[in-house]
Amino acid sequence: MSVIKITKDNFENEVMNCEKTVLLDFYADWCGPCRMVSPIVDAISEEHPEYKVGKVNVDEENQLATTFGVMSIPSLFVIRNGEVVNQTVGARTKAQILDMLK
């Protein structure tokens, strides 16, 4: 499954109303650690169809970033049944991100 670009317009449908566990990656194109995490998030999306993976560009979607209290990036959030069940800030390994999703 490919990564979905999350915006304020599709957030409710793609994230809050999703039956799958959702991994949200808050990032910016200029962020070095974000560029390290991005291919890991992409791989998880392809290798684990049981999860929905979305990315939120904080420069384009500052309202969503504010709603989630994102102060530093990359910020990863795990959402299950419309509730944040796990979150982390900073670059993480694939194993660490997969552990968050369990």
Q: Where on the chain are the PLM-derived regions?
A:
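Structural micro-motif
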Residues: N62, F68-F77, A95
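Residue-level signature of catalytic and energy-coupling elements of molecular machines
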Residues: F11, L24, V41, N57, ...
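A short beta-strand-turn-helix
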Residues: V3-V22, N62
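Non-catalytic, surface beta->alpha helical segment in thiol-disulfide oxidoreductase systems
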Residues: R80-K102
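Short pre-active-site segment immediately N-terminal to redox-active cysteine/selenocysteine motifs
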Residues: E19, F26-W30, S72
